[in-house]
Amino acid sequence: MAHKKGASSSRNGRDSNPQYLGVKKFGGEAVVAGNIIVRQRGTKFHAGKNVGVGKDHTLFALADGNVQFGVRRDRKVVDVVTE
């Protein structure tokens, strides 16, 4: 008989990193050009006036102003309203 038992292996021990998605600047909040407004997978929110889209569908401000959420043609849209 063997002196040592076979070393058991665990099937656990893996976990993916959090993605930190979601709305970063809410309606009415002031933003500076370049601020991230929404981090998302796919276009849950679409870009409106003064809002750009990154390659991972991140929405960001193109101008200084206030964030405004709305609906146009059954799409949720994010605008940056400048004074």
From Swiss-Prot:
**Pfam families listed in its UniProt record:** Ribosomal_L27
Q: Which residues form the signal peptide?
A: none
Looking at the record's lineage, which domain of life comes first?
Answer: Bacteria
- One term under GO cellular component: cytosolic large ribosomal subunit
Q: A Gene Ontology biological process annotation?
A: translation
Q: Which residues does the annotated region (Disordered) include?
A: 1-20
Keyword annotations = Ribonucleoprotein, Ribosomal protein
Q: Which cysteines are joined by disulfide bonds?
A: none
The record's annotation in SUPFAM superfamilies points to: Ribosomal L27 protein-like (SSF110324)
User: Where are its TM segments located?
Assistant: none
Write out the coiled-coil annotation as residue ranges: none
Q: Care to name a GO molecular-function term for this sequence?
A: structural constituent of ribosome
Renumbered to this chain, the Polar residues biased-composition regions fall at 7-19
Q: Which family does it belong to?
A: Belongs to the bacterial ribosomal protein bL27 family.
Q: Which HAMAP family match?
A: Ribosomal_bL27
What name has this protein been given in UniProt? Large ribosomal subunit protein bL27
Which lineage do the record's taxonomy fields give for this organism? Bacteria, Bacillati, Actinomycetota, Actinomycetes, Bifidobacteriales
